[in-house]
Structure formats: C-alpha cells, structure tokens
C-alpha cells in the first residue's frame, strides 16, 4: 500500500506524519507500506520546502515503520533523502512523473538508468501519452531497459490511453502497477480494485 503524505492534512508537522504512519502500519499489518510525498511539479498536491521534503523522508525512514520510500530523483533534496533512507536501511523507489507528455524511448531508458545510478532499489517512471505511439514508446523503453537493468522497473503511461501499460506492463518488464481502492486514484488512469 502506498501512502501519499502530500494529501494528508497534517503534512506540515513531521510528528503528525510519523504518528499517521504508525496508525497505517497497524492497519496494513505485514503488507508492504510505501511512503510517498509527491510534489506539485510531479503531479502531487503540495510543494513543501526542500528541507521539509527531506525531513519528511528522513523521519519516515527513521520511524522503522515503512518498507519502501519513494524519492523523486530530480528533487533538489534527493541525494540527502537517499542518504537518510540508506542510514535507516529503507529501500528506495526512485521516481519520475512527466505530466507534460512522453519522452522518446531512448530518453525514458536514460532516465531509468539515471535512477539506478542514483542508487535506487526500484526505478519508476510515469508519463502522459498523447497517442498510441507514446504508449508504444514507453513499452519499448521498458522492454529494452529491463534486459540490462540491475534493479526492478515500474513503468506506466497515465490516463485512458495508458491503461494497457497498467494491465499488461509485466509482459514488457514492469514489475508492479498502481491501482486504487474506491474511485479517487492518485494519478490518472489508475485501475480501481475491489475492497
């Protein structure tokens, strides 16, 4: 389960965030808990100051209650967030979300490699396709990159055009997808799951 802390009313107070992580840990039990703070630049609901973004990541990792932390690898605080995750032995999902379009397949593959070089344990990219060719480019980049990747990849195209990437991404090398409980997903095109 992913918890999007950028959507939490108490997000300005790291103590409240850590307390909520504790409550969520109790609710999800042994199921993996992913901690995410998505900034507006990458489709989130909030723009924390750089130090606050880092503090939220560091404190969530220090809590000992999360299983994976999502770090936007292009965020100015990314390297310090990675250091905090490593200090607490929390695996890192490096992510990049492009709501403006879909880069060429070679650029997608380059971004995925950059995330692996950054130190990610899992690399994730989400793009916004304009047409079927964009969807095909994402799938091509995934299938090409997975051949030489040292880490698992999660790739998806958002919106209605991208549905095929969420439902059949594993055929091309994506190791996971994101869905939603209920109607309100955190990104366009997330498939609803039964409760």
Question: Where in the sequence are the language-model features?
Answer:
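Structural preference for beta-strand elements that scaffold enzyme active sites
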Residues: 2, 30-36, 66-70, 89-93, ...
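C-terminal alpha-helical cap/extension of soluble enzyme domains
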Residues: 143-195
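Histidine/lysine/aspartate-rich catalytic loop segments that bind and position anionic ligands
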Residues: 84-121
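Generic structural signal for hydrophobic
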Residues: 24, 60-61, 85, 114-118, ...
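Glycine/small-residue-rich loop that forms an oxyanion/phosphate-binding "nest" at active or ligand-binding sites
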Residues: 33-71
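Short, acidic/polar
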Residues: 48-59, 104-114, 164
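Catalytic beta/alpha-barrel core
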Residues: 2-8, 53, 61-77, 93-103, ...
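Active-site-adjacent beta->alpha loops and helix N-cap segments on the catalytic face
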Residues: 8-26, 72-88, 103-107, 130-145
């Amino acid at each position: 389960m992913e918890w999007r802390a950028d959507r939490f009313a108490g997000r300005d107070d790291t103590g409240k965030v850590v307390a909520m992580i504790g409550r969520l840990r109790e609710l999800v039990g042994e199921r993996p808990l992913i901690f995410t703070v998505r900034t507006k630049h990458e489709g989130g609901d909030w723009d924390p100051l750089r130090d606050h973004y880092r503090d939220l990541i560091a404190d969530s990792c220090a809590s000992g209650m999360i299983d994976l932390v999502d770090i936007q690898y292009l965020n100015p605080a990314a390297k310090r967030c990675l250091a905090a995750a490593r200090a607490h032995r929390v695996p890192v999902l490096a992510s990049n979300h492009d709501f403006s379009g879909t880069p060429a397949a070679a650029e997608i593959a380059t971004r995925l490699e950059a995330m692996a070089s950054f130190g990610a344990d899992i690399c994730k990219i989400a793009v916004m396709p304009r047409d079927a060719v964009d969807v095909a480019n994402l799938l091509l980049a995934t299938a090409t990159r997975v051949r030489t990747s040292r880490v698992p990849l999660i790739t998806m195209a958002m919106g209605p055009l991208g549905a095929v990437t969420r439902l059949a991404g594993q055929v091309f090398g994506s190791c996971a997808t994101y869905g939603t409980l209920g109607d309100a997903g955190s990104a366009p095109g997330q498939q609803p799951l039964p409760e």
